[in-house]
Amino acid sequence: MQEVSNHTPMIQQYLKIKSQYPDILLFYRMGDFYELFFDDAKNAAELLDITLTARGKSNGDSIPMAGVPYHAAEGYIAKIVKKGLSVAICEQIGDPSTSKGPVERQVTRIITPATVSEEAFLDSNQDSILVSIYEKNNKYHIAYTSYTQGKIHLINTVTNSSDLKNQILKLSPQEIITNSNSLVEKNIFNKPVKVLEEWYFSNFEAKKHILNSFDNSFANNILNLYKKEQLTVIGSILAYLTNTLKSTPKHISDILLDEDQNILNIDINSRNNLELDNNSKSSLLNIMDKCKTSLGSRLLRRYFKNPTRDLNKISLRHNVIKSFKQHHYFLKIQDILSYINDIERIISRVALGTVKPKDLVSLNSSLEQLPKLKSLLEKINTSEIININNHIHQIDELTKLLNKAIVDNPPMTIRDGGVIKHGFDQELDELRGLKDNSYDFLLKFETLQKQKTGINTLKVGYNRVHGYYIELSKQYADKVPTEYIRRQTLKASERYITDELKAFEDKILSAKEKALAREKLIYDTLLNKVLEYYSQIQQTAASIAKIDVLANFAERAIKLNLNQPKFNKTGKLDIKEARHLAIEQNIDEPFIPNDTLLSTDTYTLEIITGPNMGGKSTYMRQVAQLIFLAYIGSFVPASYADIGDIDTIYTRIGASDDISSGRSTFMVEMTETAYILNNATKKSLVIMDEIGRGTSTFDGLSLAKACAEKFAKIGAMTLFATHYFELTELVNQYPNTKNIHFEAKEYKDNIYFMHKAVAGAAKKSYGIQVAKLAGISKDVLDSAKKNLANLEKGQDKLDTIDQPQQNLQLDQTPQKNHIKERLETIDINSITPIEALNILFELKKTLI
């Protein structure tokens, strides 16, 4: 901290406050500006592209200063928060007119990336998530809150960093807090993690915050229901919110345990590989999200994060989709929904004290749509719709109140008044009347003064510094009445006041102040009245979100030709004419669909061969995406789908170097493969694309074969694409394995991809033809054809290599007996891929 005593009283005050928030930008209120000083000023100037100036001296150097206008601060703060930084708002709480020295100031709120409610700070379609991780005895206890939802969720405890990473990254949090320094050091989330002081994770403090945040009955129920570690992590969130809000987070209305294990699990790598919910235009989420409200878009994202395996829930969703498709009800529903605003976040802003007058207008216009929506839903007689409709609350008394109280186009804030309608409050109308009638008084007063002085150029005016005045040109100085009191001298004129005008000024200014105070009182009373409907509005918001998602699914089903899937418990996966939605949307010609048939009774492993660009990866991805869509309750892109009991989707598709961790492409591939091998079960869907490409041919082939064998033994539903044709021989060893391939046709030295899956193994890989399509020059292609011909004849070396080559055939090496003996000791039916890799390395060393 700077040496305080060497500074002015104002800077001394600033430094004392700043010392409490060393890692946060401090917005220090000075009149109509928020000012920043020292390093904060330098950082803000760069972040916000504002001017860096100076104020006073510190150790002989100018003190850096930057500032933003108070009325425009929200936009600047939003820029900072969206960069993952936090801001402390320091307001003037004392009265400047009575203060001796600097006016009293204190931090009234801390704005962090996950604790914002204002519209400017938020992505309307995404939840703003704060995650807390409490590490104890190598266990991770997790809780999170979506700030404007008003709920805290507990997640089941995890015991390893892989599961922790998948849980946290699936949530896509804006902010992570923890008691664990090791999580910061490991950096497993690739995003900042904030380590809080120990007291945030004190069980004693946790109980205190729970008791302070909820009524006694609910608080005691929570204290009795959850274990010590769960209460501690709940308390850490409440403590953090209390510190940022500078008040108890009363908007938190519930604590939920997300213990439902009946979900389709997909790790973060598989999510990325399948492009489920990333930000790309071709992501499945982007294709499926045509919701009319931000409420619906956020709920759809929650469905994407936790697809349910509860067939009853899925059946209810399917029934609603079918009902919405009948008579095109979804169109009428979506039309109404398009007029409904984000009432969930608006009511949260009311509870948090950050609501704006225009929010109340938006809330009112949304509530006015509910009678039409409820009436339309009553025509659809399904149990799920009836249940949802019962939780849409038609709050007529509130809409009447808001219609009567708030002007149609209110100002941005209540600060300067003009929000409450004329006729709502008699006292306010009378105070405003004094102000509004001032024009008539001033007009009469000016006319009277002109007559009295005989000066027709006399003017009566007003400014904020000097108040009301009578202005006369200096040439009339000899005609100024004796009762005029000089107030201000200008270059060519003089300004005066009279006792009568001064009395009027006092009356008007007093009326303005009283009117503003009265209006603020009415506004606060109105907000308290709105807050009485908090639970009803939150329930209504949740119900509207469900209706929006299901209407969206109905629209997508018709627009994208999706059909209702079936589910079975027999371990069968039967899909006919499946399509890949993203590719289908981005090609001009018709998409070529494909069938898939796997079953625990027949085949669980497909070895897929065929040329690059032939359709192997698309085929595998479309199967995984189709199953995912089925489990979120959507219809699917296939003419028929009967889906077995699948609890997890694993994918190993593509790879690149992980430079930050010092891992090669091959190491990344093997790490992901090991994770799948160690976790896959009979209820898993496994997608493996080109395993073993990142090492030598023999190593890669050996690993790919070992992995395929392992999946055959596990019995997981596996789609295994490869260019190693040797793997097609596995059908002779494992009866639950079958071959399919993607055809290509040659005509006049050109290749044409059929994109159709056919039974059996491919005969060729067509690599040179694909290289031709890619633009490889003719001389290189001719050389490649020659090399290929030599290799196919069984030659050990290419003609272009003249120098002697080491021959690695086992029967010609001195180590022949040792290698043979070692190979004979290996049980290839029980060895793991990693063990196989180690043995290969061991054998290679003996040949060097």
Swiss-Prot record:
It comes from the Bacteria. InterPro entries: DNA_mismatch_repair_MutS (IPR005748), DNA_mismatch_repair_MutS-lik_N (IPR007695), DNA_mismatch_repair_MutS/MSH (IPR017261), DNA_mismatch_repair_MutS_C (IPR000432), DNA_mismatch_repair_MutS_clamp (IPR007861), DNA_mismatch_repair_MutS_core (IPR007696), DNA_mismatch_repair_MutS_N (IPR016151), DNA_mismatch_repair_MutS_sf (IPR036187). Gene3D superfamilies: 1.10.1420.10, DNA repair protein MutS, domain I, MutS, connector domain, P-loop containing nucleotide triphosphate hydrolases. GO terms for biological process: mismatch repair. It holds the Pfam family MutS_I. ATP binds at residues 610-617. Keywords: ATP-binding, DNA damage, DNA repair, DNA-binding, Nucleotide-binding. One of its GO terms (molecular function) is mismatched DNA binding. SMART domains: MUTSac (SM00534), MUTSd (SM00533). One of its GO terms (cellular component) is cytosol. PANTHER family: DNA MISMATCH REPAIR PROTEIN MSH1, MITOCHONDRIAL, DNA MISMATCH REPAIR PROTEIN MUTS FAMILY MEMBER. Belongs to the DNA mismatch repair MutS family. This protein is involved in the repair of mismatches in DNA. It is possible that it carries out the mismatch recognition step. This protein has a weak ATPase activity. This is DNA mismatch repair protein MutS. The lineage of its organism: Bacteria, Pseudomonadati, Pseudomonadota, Gammaproteobacteria, Thiotrichales. The gene is mutS.
